[in-house]
């Protein structure tokens, strides 16, 4: 009887450890937990792209200048509380857009204006501040 309980305990631990590694692997690939926390807890949206996949700072600056009217429209969602910045701090030589806002209503309006997962090909992050 004792050996059977030990066997069950060992098998249970093996299954548990395997499941933990499986969950870690899935999270590393999809970032599903991080996305859920960002979205539902912090009301943020991130692109989770590695630096290699980001455009250069010059490309982002050019696209922002070409679409300055859309940037102004985004900033007018809630003047003084919505900002659009080119972020080059995280990845040297590369950039994305960081759009900050004050409420979920602002976020919904901003997403409606942008209408996709990129701003004319530039990845963006939405941060509720």
Regions found by a protein language model. Give the residues of each.
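Short amphipathic alpha-helix segments
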Residues: 59-83
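Short, Lys/Arg-rich N-terminal segment immediately upstream of the first membrane anchor
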Residues: 1-6
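Solvent-exposed coil/turn segments that connect beta secondary-structure elements
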Residues: 100-104, 115, 129
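N-terminal presequence-like segments and adjacent domain-start helices
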Residues: 21-65
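Hydrophobic membrane-insertion alpha-helices, especially the h-region
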Residues: 8-27
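Short amphipathic alpha-helices in soluble, non-transmembrane regions
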Residues: 107-117
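Short proline/glycine- and acidic-rich turn/helix-capping motifs at secondary-structure junctions
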Residues: 55-60, 122-129
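Short glycine/threonine-rich beta-strand-turn micro-motifs
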Residues: 43-51, 79-106
């Amino acid at each position: 009887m004792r050996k059977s309980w030990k066997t069950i305990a060992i098998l249970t631990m093996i299954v548990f450890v395997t499941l933990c590694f499986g969950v870690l692997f899935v999270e590393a690939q999809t970032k599903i937990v991080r996305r859920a926390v960002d979205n539902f807890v912090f009301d943020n949206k991130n692109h989770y792209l590695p630096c290699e996949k980001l455009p250069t700072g010059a490309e982002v600056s050019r696209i922002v200048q070409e679409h300055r009217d859309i940037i102004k429209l985004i900033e007018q969602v809630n003047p003084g509380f919505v900002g659009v910045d080119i972020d080059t701090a995280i990845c040297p030589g590369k950039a994305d857009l960081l759009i900050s806002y004050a409420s979920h209503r602002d976020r919904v309006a901003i997403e409606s204006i942008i209408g996709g997962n990129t701003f004319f090909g530039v990845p963006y992050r939405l941060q509720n501040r």
